[in-house]
Amino acid sequence: MTQKYTEADTEAFYDHEDSMYRSFWDSEGSLHWGYFDNLADARAQDFVPACHRWNESMLAWSGLTTESRVLDIGCGNGNTAIWLAQQTGCEVVGIDISAVRVGNAKALAQEYPSLRLSFQKASVTSLPFSDNSFTHVWSQATLYHVHQRELALREIYRVLQEQGIFLFDDLITPVSEISAEGQKHVYQRLLFEPTFSYESYAKTLSEIGLMVLEAKDLSEHLNKSYQLLSELALSKYPKLSASYDKMCEAIAARELGWSFYRCQKVSDRVSWIYGTNDEKTLKDKYNAWATIYDADLDETYRCSPVLSARALANVLPNKAASILDVGAGTGMVGEALADLGYTNITAVDFSEEMLEVARKKQVYTALHQGNVAEPLTFSSPEAFDGIVVLGVFTFGHAHPKGLRNLFELLKSGGYFVLTLRVDYYESNDSLQEILEELSWSILDRVEFNIFETEPMVALVLKKH
């Protein structure tokens, strides 16, 4: 049975070991891992510069400004917090469970009276701050030591402002079974239990409302870090050096890894999506939403794909007809069509992660990544008997001119179901112009509400 550890155990470990780690890891007291320019050629002298490079990379992705208020979780001796304040002019509040390290951070901060810095001893599972206190939360090499990790993540969500950024790196456990050697040299030595995998971490974050905009598996860099740390520790601490070698073996066996996540606090995912101003951001948001999209929208939105599919079925009874599901997302329309007996459905969406969810439902004969703003080259012209378009032409999404590209894929006499928000349909002049321009006629209008009060309309059109 996995041994249980407490925060008191972790605090005692770091209070006791600070001076030892300074002697070979980083003389300034930071305990981070390196992000290397060239993994194959890195040498021991490259380790500390690689740690600094990782700080610089995280900062580049953070969006910190002079207006930012940052919570640094696991601030240690305060080096990174001070560096962030120096680089950006932001305010940084650092917390750590180690009284020794917080004391070191406070002493170091006195050398920088012009910077907005404060440090205190606190646990991330019970943050002593009010809701929505910070624009950013930053953490490095810390959360694996938190034994109530989901509680900690919910606390981080609580203190972040709406659409605030949480960026962090952490150890992960890629596999579920850990060898006795892995338990001894990794988990028991560092006083923590096997944690999330790369994928389950992202899913848990999203379920809490911390939408993962960017993620990186850094396990190769962790392996190189411990290879070099083994060299650096060998002369003074041969047993520790041997443990680092064992950690490299654990990394090779996928019993240990390292990952990075950049998240955004989002309490209302629908408004978040509609408020997008550029295509790349929209794609990133849908990729972030993919794993929990169905769970979020099942009760209040499912009627839209179901009624859109039925609208097509009313005019296209042939169950073997070729159908294109545009903006297929996680496959809700495909599921609804399959439930009605259709067997030849193709999906297209611009989000890779949404399509991966759709693929697992096994209702499509083919799935393609594509953007309706451009010609869809996976198909020849006039290839489909029916096309369903849901959630594509709306606020913050595709321009109505994309309808021209879809029109080309529909057979003469084919049917096109275009489902829209009523307010978008009635207010978008470009949409009205293109609908009138294309050679088709409206056969039916199906009106309904999503999210209880949001009016929708499904237009059923036939191509001349």
What are these regions (language model features)?
Residues L71, N77-S126, L324-L376:
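Class I SAM-dependent methyltransferase SAM/SAH-binding core
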